[in-house]
Regions:
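Active-site-proximal segment of RNA-dependent polymerases
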Residues: 227-280
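Short amphipathic beta-strand starts and helix->beta connectors
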Residues: 215-218, 264-268, 346-349
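Flexible linker/loop signature enriched in Pro/Ser/Thr and Pro/Gly
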Residues: 263-270, 312, 555, 560-565
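A short, surface-exposed helix-loop junction/capping segment
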Residues: 223-230, 319-325
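Short helix/loop capping segments that flank catalytic or ligand/cofactor-binding pockets
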Residues: 230, 242-243, 287-290, 403-404
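Conserved polymerase palm-domain catalytic core
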Residues: 248, 273-356, 361-380, 384-400, ...
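C-terminal, non-catalytic extensions of nucleic-acid polymerases
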Residues: 1-229, 291, 369, 433-567
Length: 567
């Protein structure tokens, strides 16, 4: 049934997307500033519905990957390696020095804490998707670090009791006969040099002995669309740990001095766009933070750590390329450095400017001089998606109609590749139908929504409670499953819970399993029975329908729902 459901949903939604595309509504860009009301909302939904809904082109993946990587390397090669702020015009030099002074104040109490944070993603040595850090620690090939990052990474492991133990045990296993003499020699060497922490000195050598030294970042890609891939880099494992640790310290300085907390600032930006301030969008921002400019902009106490933790070489297809940018996505501190850099520039034109990565919000009168200034420093402003005037604003994936003072609900409709994705896609369309009042886009979505009802089983029908998009229920107001009666015990116990327990009864068809081996079974099943001494529960070919009672909100069976609140 899963394959049939998948094919049906793909066909139904594909037809709807093509109908929406035929309307010829403008794509997301400068024209949106002139739209308002239902016309604006329809154009936004149409853009997001059509831009990403396409069957994955597997045949062209190699060519697309090569083209994307070459474009990335060309961008890197075009960045300047020499920067002197004295070459800037006087007004621009004043803004640059103001940004440097602002950063010096924000980072005045920056001190590395060497805290540990779990890295994610592939390392410089690929593990084919096995990115769990505990898994990496069990593999010799994943113990990688650049030579300059060894002291920083070793300090992180030294200050974490569990990592410290792992390193010591690994060192003992690698040098079972000499580890004690080697560690004692390093410790005595530190004592002779009167170092502050001889134990750390000895541990650093032990840590380096456990690792392979890798001085490059591996270039790879992740799918974006059928025209272009997103290029990222894969770092040595312990470089990733050190980069994330440094990023957390930078975030803490930013939070203490400005009140901007990266952890939840995306949600703040989604609210700030309703103020009507200008929103500035950049193209390829993470790849245009020039390293020579960063060295002149940030305090030396930060730059010296950046120098040690970033790799100065890219590796791709056996060739090596110097890194002229700070670091692309894939490096642990790229996003935080991007936020600090652009925020420092924006604050020179608007003291109330805000930044989250490359999403900038500032006053309308400050937008033009800000964009002119950053373009002189190598940044590329996406003018088609930058909104200074008009009724439309966009930031961090949120869209606002200033004329009606409301956020516009919209979704990216993506090609489903499994049954769970079908449910999510269907629920997106369900919510879009409810949020639109009228218009040709709504008419198309309504027809699509009605056809989807025949695709999903009625037992999956459920009311939309306004929560997350569900991947096992289809949101509809039609009756599907029957409401199950609650026993007296459930009613009493659920009264002590934070919410009342509502039950729904759904039918499920399953094969009836036999409990005994028959004489007419084949030889393979008989051999299995003789070896095991019991039946494997071989299906008899008959199907039996059973009713399963589940919690209406969570989908859990009643036995899995805690009915008593300890609070």
């Amino acid at each position: 049934m899963g394959k049939t459901l998948l094919k049906q949903v793909q066909e139904v939604v594909s037809e709807a997307v093509e109908d929406i595309r035929s309307l010829g509504l403008p794509p997301l860009g400068a024209e949106f500033a002139q739209l308002h009301g239902t016309d604006l909302h329809q154009a936004l939904i149409a853009h997001r519905a059509t831009k990403g809904f396409e069957r994955p082109n597997v045949r062209g993946s190699a060519r697309r990957r090569e083209s994307s990587v070459r474009g990335f390397l060309d961008t890197n090669a075009s960045l300047t390696t020499q920067f002197n702020y004295w070459d800037l015009a006087a007004p621009d030099r004043r803004s640059f020095l103001g940004a440097r002074a602002w950063l010096s104040g924000v980072l005045t109490d920056f001190v590395p804490t060497y805290r540990f944070a779990f890295p994610s993603g592939e390392g410089v040595i690929s593990e084919q998707g096995m990115t769990d850090f505990f898994h990496k620690l069990s593999l010799d090939s994943q113990w990688t670090v650049s030579i300059d990052a060894v002291p920083y990474a070793a300090r992180i492991a030294y200050r974490n009791a569990s990592l410290k133990r792992v390193v010591r045990e690994r060192f003992r296993a690698q040098f079972p006969y000499h580890w004690r003499r080697m560690a004692r020699g390093w410790y005595e060497e530190a004592q002779k040099k009167k170092l502050r922490d001889p134990g750390l000195h000895s541990f650093t050598y032990m840590f380096a002995g456990c690792c392979d030294i890798v001085g490059v970042s591996r270039i790879t890609t992740v799918p974006k669309n059928n025209e272009k891939d997103r290029v990222i880099t894969c770092e040595p494992t312990w470089n990733m740990v050190a980069q994330l640790s440094l990023a957390l310290d930078l975030r803490e300085c930013l939070r203490r001095r400005t009140g901007i907390s990266i952890q939840f600032w995306q949600e703040v930006h989604k609210s700030l766009i309703r103020s009507g301030r200008a929103t500035v969008d950049f193209s390829d921002a993470s790849n245009r933070n020039i390293w020579s400019v960063v060295k002149a902009l940030f305090p030396r106490r930060v730059v010296r750590h950046l120098e040690k933790l970033r790799n100065a070489l890219f590796e791709y297809d056996g060739e090596y390329y110097p890194v002229n940018m700070l670091a692309p996505m894939g490096c642990g501190f790229t996003f935080d450095m991007l936020t600090l850099t652009l925020l420092a520039y924006a604050r020179q034109f608007d003291p109330a400017a805000s930044a989250f990565g490359d999403d900038i919000i500032l006053s309308q009168e400050s937008a033009a001089p800000f964009m002119e200034f950053v373009e002189k420093l190598g940044w590329k402003v996406n003018h088609s998606k930058t909104y200074v005037a008009g009724n439309f604003r966009e930031s961090c994936g949120a869209f606002c109609d200033l004329g009606e003072d409301k956020l516009l609900l919209s979704y990216d409709l993506l090609w489903p590749d499994d049954e769970q994705a079908c449910y999510v896609l269907g629920n997106k369309i369900s919510r879009l139908v409810k949020t639109l009042n009228r218009g040709p886009v709504r008419d198309i979505l309504v027809r699509c929504y009605e056809r989807l009802h025949s695709c999903f089983p009625r037992d999956a029908y459920a009311e939309d409670d306004g929560g997350d998009l569900c991947d096992w229920l289809f949101f509809t107001e039609e009756e599907g499953c029957t409401n199950a009666a609650r026993s007296t015990a459930v009613q009493l116990w659920s009264a002590m819970w934070q919410r009342p327990i509502e039950l729904r009864s759904a039918s499920e068809s399953r094969a009836v399993e036999g409990n005994a081996v028959k004489h007419d079974i084949d030889n393979v099943r008989l051999a299995c029975f003789l070896r095991r001494g019991a039946s494997y529960g071989i299906p008899t070919g008959k199907f039996k329908e059973s009713r399963i009672t589940r919690d209406k909100k969570s989908g859990e069976t009643l036995s899995g729902v805690t009915l008593v609140s300890i609070l």
